[in-house]
Regions:
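Short, conserved beta-strand edge motifs with alternating hydrophobic and charged residues
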Residues: 22, 66-68
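Active-site beta-strand-loop-beta-strand hairpin of nuclease catalytic cores
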Residues: 48-65
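Domain-level recognition of nuclease-like catalytic cores that cleave nucleotide substrates
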Residues: 102-147
Length: 147
């Protein structure tokens, strides 16, 4: 929950992103792009265009909708989230200039490896705390496509 969001935000800041200029917290995607006056064609193709993301990040070439969570145990919530985010990732592939990112971690994944593997197959932008420590947000600045 909030601890994971705070951790992710600390890495955004560490990578030089500034709140409101470069990223928004708990923001609807369409509100964020309107606020920044960015054109994201075909956004309506994504069922979740009205979705509130934990973070919306913008770089020169890309807008990222970022969801974060940490699972201390496995279960149906983890499974449903994995399926939902995999679908969101598939829809996002058709939207030039937008990438969906899922940052997740926790020991709950130890017993749900199949769900995580399935999510990875359709969503190439699944990251964990180790990826944050290794500067994944620095790489976003240079990204020109959906993952």
């Amino acid at each position: 929950g909030k601890k994971m969001e705070s951790l992710v935000e600390s890495y955004l800041i560490k990578s030089g992103y500034k709140y409101q200029d470069d990223y928004l917290k708990e923001s609807f995607l369409i509100d964020a792009i309107a606020n920044w006056n960015i054109d994201v064609p075909n956004l309506e193709k994504m069922d979740q265009s009205r979705k509130r993301f934990d973070f919306v990040l913008r770089t020169t070439n890309q807008v990222y909708g970022i969801e974060t969570n940490f699972y201390t145990s496995s279960g149906s919530k983890l499974n449903e989230t994995a399926k939902s985010y995999a679908l969101l990732g598939l829809q996002a592939k058709d939207i030039k200039g937008f990438t969906f990112v899922w940052i997740t971690d926790g020991k709950g994944w130890k017993n749900a490896k199949k769900d995580l593997r399935n999510a990875f197959q359709s969503l190439k932008t699944v990251f964990n705390i180790n990826d944050l420590e290794n500067g994944i947000f620095d790489q976003f600045r240079n990204c020109h496509g959906n993952g």
